[in-house]
Amino acid sequence: MKKLFLIIGAPGSGKTTDASMIAANDDKFAHYSTGDLLRAEVASGSELGKLIDSFISKGNLVPLEVVVNTIISAIRSSDKNYILIDGYPRSEEQMRELDRVLASQSEVKLDGVIEVDVSEEVARNRVLGRARGADDNNEVFNNRMKVYLDPIKEIRAFYNDKKILHMINGERTIETIVADMKNLIENLIKG
């Protein structure tokens, strides 16, 4: 059975960097972001990829069920047994659909949800300081923060009730955060 770990956090929390560093330094882990998975499925030319492309090419959102099926498909086809996915779920609907799909199969088990916790001020400084793209301005940051914050209480409560939510302080050095997250994941794997 494959073990899935979801890494969540505010924009600028470092969740993508943390997860990619763990996977880069330990080859038993695979790391995916939802956007990468959708693009890879399109590139594969599969039926699912063609369906995804029919939405993306028109600038439409990919339906929830398709996104979750893409995630599960990628996990199943991965040659790794430990999967890190960052930035998912972003809504209550995404969370509930993933939970529904995971409950209906026995190949993948969600072993942990790790939230990289940073203050809004730290997140803002990181995002506006890095200025990676056109979307890294104050107005867009505020919107992204709202999108993150609106469902987070429900997401935390849901995974807390399942006893799989873990918080990591994201306001330390990257080395410390990654080491902490890796230790936490290793302990969860051991059970």
UniProtKB/Swiss-Prot annotation:
InterPro entries given in the database record: Adenylat/UMP-CMP_kin, Adenylat_kinase_CS, P-loop_NTPase
Chief location of this protein within or outside the cell: cytoplasm
Molecular function via GO: adenylate kinase activity; ATP binding
Swiss-Prot/TrEMBL GO biological process terms: AMP salvage
Gene3D superfamilies: P-loop containing nucleotide triphosphate hydrolases
Gene Ontology, cellular component aspect: cytoplasm
Region (LID): 129-135
Listed CDD domains: ADK
Binding-site residues, AMP: 34, 39, 60-62, 87-90, 94, 132, 144
UniProt region (NMP), positions on chain: 33-62
Positions that bind ATP: 12-17, 130, 172
Localisation per UniProt entry: Cytoplasm
Record bears the keyword Flavoprotein: no
Function: Catalyzes the reversible transfer of the terminal phosphate group between ATP and AMP. Plays an important role in cellular energy homeostasis and in adenine nucleotide metabolism.
Homology family: Belongs to the adenylate kinase family.
Protein name: Adenylate kinase
Originating species: Campylobacter fetus subsp. fetus (strain 82-40)
Organismal lineage: Bacteria, Pseudomonadati, Campylobacterota, Epsilonproteobacteria, Campylobacterales
